[in-house]
């Protein structure tokens, strides 16, 4: 039986910690495809496609000797293409399903699919000459399972209030760092552990995710902190008052009730409802403003549209470098010259493999740097108050002696939505500056400088996902979060398809020289500053509106009688 939302709230730290571990070892593990490809080739997957006369390489273990060829790699990469496509393209339907049914069923399905994926790979490795086609189904299930686990974990930060963006960044960081998983698995494989044992063990661990979800994840979705209070409520004559209600807020409620009593006398049949009703207290209405926002308004909002441009451009920049990195390193080492001797070829290959391994290890930086951008998104949120509304009393004003009829001294508060926009501006500006710095590092043909490019690439890859997730959680209703995030991921994946054309241009007409492609992408990177620029404009407009509504408290008390 699924736990209640209240029970899940008490277990939120356990759920968050286990979700980070689960994302790290079970989400986007296909991003470490290079290591998995080596293991699959050693196990002999599609080795039958390699005729003896076309043999390009031979790998040998204690019992078998398998051949390797271009046809084998093309077939295996086709499986990777399918799996990686599902890893990104299914985000939109998953977002719609999660908004409708909550994260629990999707997480159960995802963990089951991951276990099935590992089991299929283990079974197929027993007789690769016959069962090699199972790798397509296994990789497809792996990609689908990864996005299910990742997507559902992004709802957990809603239970952490003002730290929501920080925990969301931690979830995205563990997802981005999962590229290190297959390189780690390969180390175990190289130590002599059979591939079948590794896959069956991994499948068993995935079953623990299923069990953890069944025991701890509630059936309903996690509402945003602005939409529900997970903490204990105190019932008072049919009215749910938060135990943290401030004196000013209670004074506002009593004033409104007093104004209602001055207009009519309640009958006995009306009971206590005539004196006290939940809508009189700000933030306790049954239907929150966020719930009433139509999805079309969120979809067509300028913030979402500009985020599509920024995220699509950044995704293209990041994915192109991941796909073309080996060729870029090779061009830097050789200077564009042909390798004439076997010794030169071997030296180039060793250098490229060394730097590629460094790049793989650096993926763990995502786990360390993503919380930083989340901290930026959460900066000073806990010190903020809700926005004022026209014709109502500002809860966080300093009333002084207003209740005694004396002059009122007014204090301008810091509003939550304005602060969230400020934090988003800072986060996206920092990310875009790092992206431009990464582009400049790519233009310089220096091998050691590529280490800086590795660091900047890894940080940007974690930052821009975390910043976007924090922005969506801060600006849009929580019931739109899954669909909007899924749509953004799908459109970004379409943008990323252009990297294949850029790669073909680099190895074809440009003869392996990445300079012009990197220059074009660097210029394109400046489009990323359009989103924080619009957020700055939107924040200024919002501040003017708040300043207009921020009227004198005594005037509000006098005019509220007319409103009632």
Curated annotation (Swiss-Prot):
- Any GO BP annotation: negative regulation of L-leucine import across plasma membrane
Identify the keywords attached in UniProt to this record, alphabetized. Answer: Amino-acid transport, Cell membrane, Endoplasmic reticulum, Glycoprotein, Membrane, Phosphoprotein, Transmembrane, Transmembrane helix, Transport
Cellular location(s): Cell membrane; Apical cell membrane; Endoplasmic reticulum membrane
Q: Any idea which residues bear Phosphoserine here?
A: 262, 267, 398
What up-regulates or down-regulates this gene?
Answer: By nutrient starvation.
Q: How does it sit in the membrane?
A: Multi-pass membrane protein
> What job does this protein perform?
Uniport that mediates the transport of neutral amino acids such as L-leucine, L-isoleucine, L-valine, and L-phenylalanine. The transport activity is sodium ions-independent, electroneutral and mediated by a facilitated diffusion.
Name assigned to this protein: Large neutral amino acids transporter small subunit 3
Which lineage do the record's taxonomy fields give for this organism?
Answer: Eukaryota, Metazoa, Chordata, Craniata, Vertebrata
């Amino acid at each position: 039986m699924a736990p209640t939302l209240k029970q899940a709230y008490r277990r939120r730290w356990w759920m968050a910690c286990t979700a980070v571990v689960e994302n790290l070892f079970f989400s986007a593990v296909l991003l470490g495809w290079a290591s998995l490809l080596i293991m699959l080739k050693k196990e002999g997957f599609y080795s039958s496609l390699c005729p003896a006369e076309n043999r390009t390489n031979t790998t040998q273990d204690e019992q078998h000797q398998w051949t390797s060829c271009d046809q084998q790699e093309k077939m295996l990469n086709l499986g990777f293409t399918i799996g990686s496509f599902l890893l990104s393209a299914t985000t939109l339907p998953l977002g719609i399903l999660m908004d409708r049914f909550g994260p629990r069923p999707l997480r159960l399905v995802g963990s089951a699919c991951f276990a099935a994926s590992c089991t299929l790979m283990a079974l197929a490795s027993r007789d690769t000459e016959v069962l090699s086609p199972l790798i397509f189904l296994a990789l497809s299930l792996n990609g689908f399972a990864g996005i299910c686990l990742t997507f559902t974990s992004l709802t957990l930060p809603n239970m952490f209030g003002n730290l929501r963006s920080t925990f969301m960044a931690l979830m995205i960081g563990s997802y981005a760092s999962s590229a290190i998983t297959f390189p780690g698995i390969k180390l175990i494989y190289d130590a002599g552990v059979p591939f079948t044992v590794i896959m069956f063990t991994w499948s068993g661990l995935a079953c623990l995710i299923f069990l953890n979800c069944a025991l701890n994840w509630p059936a309903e979705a996690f509402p945003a902190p602005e939409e529900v209070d997970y903490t204990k409520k105190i019932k008072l004559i049919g009215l749910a008052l938060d135990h943290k209600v401030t004196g000013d807020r209670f004074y506002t409620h009593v004033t409104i009730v007093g104004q209602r009593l001055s207009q009519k006398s309640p009958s006995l049949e009306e009971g206590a409802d005539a004196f006290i009703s939940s809508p009189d207290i700000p933030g306790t209405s049954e239907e929150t403003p966020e719930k009433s926002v139509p999805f079309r308004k969120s979809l067509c909002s300028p913030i979402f549209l500009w985020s599509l441009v920024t995220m699509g451009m950044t995704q293209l920049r990041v994915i192109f470098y991941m796909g073309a990195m080996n060729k870029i390193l090779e061009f830097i080492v050789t200077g564009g010259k042909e390798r004439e001797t076997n010794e030169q070829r071997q030296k180039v290959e060793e250098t490229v493999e060394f730097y590629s391994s460094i790049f793989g290890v650096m993926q763990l930086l995502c786990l360390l740097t993503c919380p930083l951008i989340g901290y930026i998104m959460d900066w000073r949120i806990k010190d903020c108050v809700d926005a004022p509304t026209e014709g109502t009393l500002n809860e966080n004003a300093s009333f002084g002696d207003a209740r005694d009829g004396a002059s009122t001294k007014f204090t301008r508060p810091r509003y939550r939505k304005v602060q969230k926009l400020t934090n988003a501006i800072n986060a996206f500006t920092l990310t875009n500056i790092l992206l431009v710095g990464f582009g400049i590092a790519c233009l310089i043909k220096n091998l050691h400088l590529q280490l800086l490019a590795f660091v900047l690439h890894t940080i940007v890859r974690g930052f821009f996902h975390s910043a976007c997730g924090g922005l969506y959680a801060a600006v849009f209703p929580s019931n739109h979060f899954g669909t909007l995030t899924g749509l953004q991921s799908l459109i970004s994946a379409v943008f990323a398809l252009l990297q294949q054309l850029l790669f073909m241009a680099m190895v074809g007409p440009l003869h392996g020289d990445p300079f012009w492609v990197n220059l074009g992408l660097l210029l394109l990177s400046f489009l990323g500053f359009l989103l924080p620029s619009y957020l700055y404009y939107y924040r200024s407009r919002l501040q003017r509106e708040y300043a207009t509504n921020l009227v004198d408290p005594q005037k509000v008390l006098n005019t509220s009688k007319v409103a009632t």
